[in-house]
C-alpha cells in the first residue's frame, strides 16, 4: 500500500472557486479510484488560493481483476442438430474476441444461452494513475476558466506546477504545458524556493507549514480565528461575527496575519451598515464592536504576508478605507438634501423592465397588490400604511448612497425615513421588504413589511412570466426562483392563509395595462405551476417525496394549510399502524376513481345487508362530526388520529363486502358509503400517492 499525493499549483484562484473545487477533487478522485478498481483508504482534499491538493492513503499496488460475462444467442440457435456451432455462435464468439470453443452454456431468465466469461487482469497502480489524474484535473469545472495561449487546456487560473507522487515515486501527469514533478513551492514571498516532497500527506502539510503555508483549511481557519481574536483585544473590543467573511478570507490567504487599523470617529455618524458594508464588501476588513455590539472606529484587516513593520501595512489599509468613507459621507450628506417623498417621481425615469415599465409603475402596482392581500387576510387597517410603504420602498434606488453601495438598497431608505421622522413601522417595512435575501436569511419583522415583500415578489413573478420571460435550468436572470421561495417562506412563517390563485389574480389585475405574452388564464397557471414546483422542491428536502406529492395532490392553494397537513401526515407515517391505514384508504380512493364519481347514492341504512357494511356506517357516524370540527380548526394530527380509528372497519368491509355488486341499488349504496369514507381524508392527502404496505401479519391475516 502507498499514499497517492496530487497537487495543482496555480496563480491566485478566486476565493469563491476554491471550496467547490476541493469538494469536486475529493469526490471525483474517490469515484475514479473505485471505477479503476484500486482499493484505497482516506481520500481528502486541502487547498489555498495558490494550490489545490488531494490525497488517497493506502492505495493498492494493483487493480483487482475484472471478471465480465457476456450472453449470446439461445443455445437452440447457437448449435445445429448435430451440436455444431452455427453462424450465430461463431459471430458472437468473434464479437467477443474469443474462439468458439470458449463458449459455455448458461441459464438466464430468458432461458439457456451461450455465454463467454472474460477476465481482465489488473494493471499496476502506477500504470493506471497518470491518465486517471489527467482526467481529474481536466474535469474540474469553474464558473470562469482561463485557457493557455499555447494549448486548449483550461483552469481557473494559469497552472504553474503539479505534484503527482505514489509512495514517494513521481508519476508523469500532464496538463497543458505543465508536467508534474515531486517539488512544491511555499509562500510566494516568504518561502518561494522549491520544496522536495516525500509523498505522504503528513510530510506535505508539515513542509508547507514551515514554508508559511497552512494548506489544510481546517488548520488555517483555526489560525485565522485566533488572529482575529487577538486583534480584537488589541483594538479594545471584539471582531464582529461574520462567518461569510471568515469563509471568504480563509481562501484569500495562505497564512493569515491580522492587522488592526483605525478610522476617524466622525464616520461613526454614518449608518453602521454603510461603514460595515464598505469594510467587508469592498475591502474585506472585519468590523470591531464594543461589549454592547456598537461599532467602534477600528477594523481588522487580514494580510496574506507577515511584514516586518506592521505600521506600514496598517497605514496602507487605513488610507484606502479613509478615501472610501469620505465618499460615503459625501453621498450621505447629499442624499439628505432631498426628502424621500420628493424622490418618488424620479422613479418614473428609472426602468424596471422594458415590458413592465418604470420603477414608479412597479411601486404603484406593489401598493395595489399589498392592499388586496391585506383585505384578503382581514387586515384592512394596514392598507393606508401599505400604500405609503409601497410608494417609498424603491425610492432609495435613486440615491447616491445606493448607487455607490447597491447592497444597501432598502437599508438606506429606512435610515432616511427614520431621520425624516416617518412612522417607524413604515421605515422598517422599507428595509424589510427585501427580506429574505437568501434561503436562510431573516424575514420581515411585521405584517407591513411582510405584505410589501410578498407583493413585490408577486409583481416580479407574475409580471416577468406574464411578458414571456422564463427561468431555465441554466439561468434565472430575473431571480424568479428567489422570488417564489421568498413568497413561500414569508407566507408560511407568518401563517397567512392566503389563496395563491387569488393572489395571482390580484396581481394580474394590477398588471392590467401590461401586454401579456399569453392569455390571462394561461399566465396564471404558469405562475401557479412555478410556485408549486418551488413548494415541491423545498419540501422534499425535509419530507418523503411521496407524502409531499400526496398532500399537493389534495390541494396546495393555501400553502400554510398544506404544510400543516404534510407535517401531520409525516408524524402519522412514523407510527407502526400507518401502513394498514394507508393501504385501506388507498383502496377507498381507487374505488372512487374507478367509479368516476358516478353511481354513488346517499347511504340508505335499509340497503345495508352485510354486518361489515353496517359496522362501517356505525363507525362513520361516530367520527364524522368530530372530523369536521377538527378539520375546521386545522388540527390535522387529531383528524388523522380520528380517521385512523376507521381502519379496522374499512378492512373488514373490503374483506367481506363486494362493492361493485350486480344489483344497481346495492352498488350505489356501497359507493355512497365509500364516498363518505373518502370525504374524511380526500382534502388532507391523496393516499394513492403514498408508498406504504400493510404489516406482514396484517397481510397474512
From Swiss-Prot:
Entry GO CC? cytosol
**Know the name of this protein?**
Glycine--tRNA ligase beta subunit
Q: Extract the HAMAP family matched here.
A: Gly_tRNA_synth_beta
InterPro entries xref list? DALR_anticod-bd, Gly-tRNA-synth_bsu, Gly-tRNA-synth_heterodimer
The enzyme class is ligase
Q: A GO molecular function for this record?
A: glycine-tRNA ligase activity
The highest taxon in the source lineage is: Bacteria
Keyword Ligase attributed: yes
E.C. code: 6.1.1.14
Family assignment from sequence similarity: Belongs to the class-II aminoacyl-tRNA synthetase family.
